[in-house]
Swiss-Prot record:
The keyword Phosphoprotein does not apply. GO terms for biological process: translation. PANTHER family: 40S RIBOSOMAL PROTEIN S11 FAMILY MEMBER, SMALL RIBOSOMAL SUBUNIT PROTEIN US17M. This is Small ribosomal subunit protein uS17. One of the primary rRNA binding proteins, it binds specifically to the 5'-end of 16S ribosomal RNA. It comes from Rickettsia prowazekii (strain Madrid E). Belongs to the universal ribosomal protein uS17 family. Part of the 30S ribosomal subunit. One of its GO terms (molecular function) is structural constituent of ribosome. Keywords: Ribonucleoprotein, Ribosomal protein, RNA-binding, rRNA-binding. The keyword Manganese does not apply. One of its GO terms (cellular component) is cytosolic small ribosomal subunit.
Length: 77
């Protein structure tokens, strides 16, 4: 089964080896036919602490690293 890859923006890099990535997606509401923007935050593993706030990154699913971390930063976009 292929791993999911998401694109988002780093909104926090205060913790050691972890960044918080905000991923936004747009979809059309089934009843109102209006495009709705929904965002979700993911904790991603950053081994080298090289990503800063505002960076656009790709994250990929991985094995559980901690209680809330199951994503790893793949690369900078």
């Amino acid at each position: 089964m292929p791993k999911r890859v998401l694109q988002g923006v780093v909104i926090s890099s205060k913790t050691d080896k972890t960044v918080t990535v905000k991923v936004e997606r747009k979809f059309k509401h089934p009843i109102y036919k209006k495009f709705v923007k929904v965002s979700k935050k993911y904790a991603a593993h950053d081994i080298e602490n090289k990503y800063k706030e505002g960076d656009k990154v790709s994250i990929v699913e991985s094995r559980p690293i901690s209680k809330t971390k199951t994503w790893v930063v793949l690369n900078l976009e």
